[in-house]
Amino acid sequence: MKSERIQTKGFKFKQFSIHGGESGMPVSTDGVMLGAWVNCIPQNKILDIGTGTGLLALMCAQRFPSAQITALDIEITAIEAAKQNFAQSTWSDRLSLHHSDVLQFEPEHRFERIICNPPYFNSGEQSKQSQRATARHTDTLQHSALLNRCHELLTNEGTASFVLPITEGEQFITMALQQGWHLSRLCRVQPSQKKPVHRLLFELAKQACDTQETHLIIHSSEGYSDDFTQLTREFYLKM
């Protein structure tokens, strides 16, 4: 008896839509924040590691009109959804998609920017949907191996941007510094003024640099905060 295939809820943004397909990877606030926060210049070659349904790649395509974006994922249902989302966007000529593990991926060039919403569950707990388990279990792509591979794939002036829960993010940053990376940007994110920091947005550089630190509160007493609205207004329909 075949298991029931669960459709993942889609999401409509101002300039593109996300079809979830059977990916098990719904649009998340983490992903939207990272895609809106990442620093690039228009001509950059960008690599999106673990693209899922293609959200980060599409956000970068919208924000940086001349950027060439390469997206990878190891999960075939994610690739199928991302392929549809890329084809339906106005930037399909600047988006390339590869069904590949980044550890085995051999591009023809290095990248100026890498963007990644990495797996972070270390507890071994299993998801009800195997695709989401693949997307989120650290043993699929160990953070140390991810950092090493990012270092190899970046140009000397390149940077890599990530979003993680605070505990995993602090551990990831510590590991990166031990491996010779430099922390160029760090944003601490709170759900609201009364709740503690729960996410870190951060950018790692290969070259020595000062760290630019900022703070973001998502919700105010009246809804989304002004800072969150300013960050994401190019994307969310009701901003």
Curated annotation (Swiss-Prot):
Primary residence: cytoplasm
Gene3D superfamilies: Vaccinia Virus protein VP39
Keywords, in A-Z order: Cytoplasm, Methyltransferase, S-adenosyl-L-methionine, Transferase, tRNA processing
EC number assigned by the record: 2.1.1.223
Pfam families: MTS
GO molecular function, one term: nucleic acid binding
Cell compartment(s), UniProt: Cytoplasm
Catalytic reaction equation(s): adenosine(37) in tRNA1(Val) + S-adenosyl-L-methionine = N(6)-methyladenosine(37) in tRNA1(Val) + S-adenosyl-L-homocysteine + H(+)
GO annotation, biological process: methylation; tRNA processing
Disulfide bonds: none
Keyword Cell cycle: no
Highest taxon above the source species: Bacteria
GO CC terms of this entry: cytoplasm
Keyword S-adenosyl-L-methionine belongs to the record: yes
Protein family: Belongs to the methyltransferase superfamily. tRNA (adenine-N(6)-)-methyltransferase family.
Role summary: Specifically methylates the adenine in position 37 of tRNA(1)(Val) (anticodon cmo5UAC).
Protein name: tRNA1(Val) (adenine(37)-N6)-methyltransferase
Organism expressing this protein natively: Vibrio campbellii (strain ATCC BAA-1116)
